A protein has these predicted regions:
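Non-catalytic terminal and boundary segments that flank Rossmann-like NAD(P)-dependent oxidoreductase
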Residues: 1-42, 274
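C-terminal helical subdomain
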Residues: 6-8, 18-24, 209, 216, ...
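N-terminal Rossmann NAD(P)H-binding glycine-rich loop of SDR-like oxidoreductase domains
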Residues: 49-59
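Conserved glycine-rich Rossmann-like NAD(P)H-binding loop of the short-chain dehydrogenase/reductase
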Residues: 61-78
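Rossmann-fold cofactor-recognition segment
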Residues: 80-94
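Hydrophobic structural elements of the Rossmann-like NAD(P)H-binding subdomain
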Residues: 112, 164, 214-217, 227
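Catalytic loop of short-chain dehydrogenase/reductase
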Residues: 117-137, 145, 159-209
Length: 275
């Protein structure tokens, strides 16, 4: 068995090395990405009304996929969607019933669990926000289980379907010593992403016998409203426009197979991240 090659936890160093070695996979996703493979696929994207979710949906539309966008309140302001289902709060069981009802029996080829929440204020042990921590875990981790469970129990996920868990490198316990040295510590964010990673791994194990493949993905460092509190380090750490991040995610979706699933993938370079 070949040795696993992991991504570098030191993001400034990782980005510098990518430039030094002219890593096309990391620096020019267009050089490896074949979006035509997504043509005709029915894809459901949660949290598709802004940020990375919007960018992923737009990329899929450009590749002629049939995109179903869900959102909690404000509807997407772009065109080309196959369907929009609003009122989908991933923390609400009744919203899951509505989601299934509004899908009207439509089977899903690819489910992208993207809906998330990131508290703006930074957390330390001196100023924890317990309510916000629980909220982040409920949305980012339990929410992904709610959506996947609702679709699976309604038989809208089938053999050959793919489930993508959008999480974060922030959920890697192994990387905390490097990435959180000196803070910020952001307990809620990191706990919610670690929980999402665990949920994704368990889903991958449980759904594989049904022919449904699950992958856990860190989408890379993207310039969105959710990461704006880190904008001072965007450039040194290689943050990209969300449109580029979307292509990275879609490229990794194409690579999901019976031989490559249930992994924690850094969409930035295609390498694994340790749990």
């Amino acid at each position: 068995m070949s040795e696993i090659k992991f991504s570098d936890p030191n993001q400034p160093q990782r980005f510098a090395n990518q430039k030094k070695t002219n890593d096309k996979r990391a620096l020019d996703i267009e050089s490896v990405y074949d979006g035509e493979k997504l043509s005709g696929k029915v894809v459901l994207v949660t949290g598709a009304n802004r940020g990375l979710g919007e960018a992923i949906a737009k990329e899929l539309i450009s590749q002629k996929a049939k995109v179903i966008a869900t959102c909690r309140s404000s509807k997407p302001k772009y065109e080309g969607l196959h369907k929009v289902i609003d009122g989908i709060d991933v923390t609400d069981k009744k919203a899951m019933d509505k989601l299934v009802k509004d899908l009207e029996g439509q089977e899903i080829d690819i489910l992208i669990n993207n809906a998330g929440y990131f508290m703006v204020e930074k957390e330390t042990i001196e100023n924890p926000n317990f309510d916000e921590e629980v909220k982040m875990i409920d949305i980012c981790a339990v929410g992904q289980i709610r959506v996947t469970s609702a679709l699976f129990n309604a038989k809208l996920l089938k053999k050959g379907s793919k489930v993508v868990q959008i999480t974060s490198q922030g959920g890697s316990i192994a990387w905390r010593t490097t990435q959180n040295a000196g803070g910020p510590f952001d307990y809620g964010h990191h706990m919610s992403k670690a929980a999402a990673n665990m949920a994704g791994k368990l889903l991958a194990i449980e759904l594989a016998p049904h022919g449904i493949l699950v992958q856990i993905m860190h989408p890379g460092f993207n310039k969105t409203d959710m990461t704006k509190k880190y904008e001072k380090i965007w450039e040194v750490e290689g943050a990209v426009d969300a449109s580029v991040g979307a292509k990275r995610v879609c490229h990794e979706i194409n690579l999901i197979s019976p031989e490559r699933y249930g992994l924690f993938i850094n969409c930035e370079d295609g390498l694994q991240i340790p749990w």
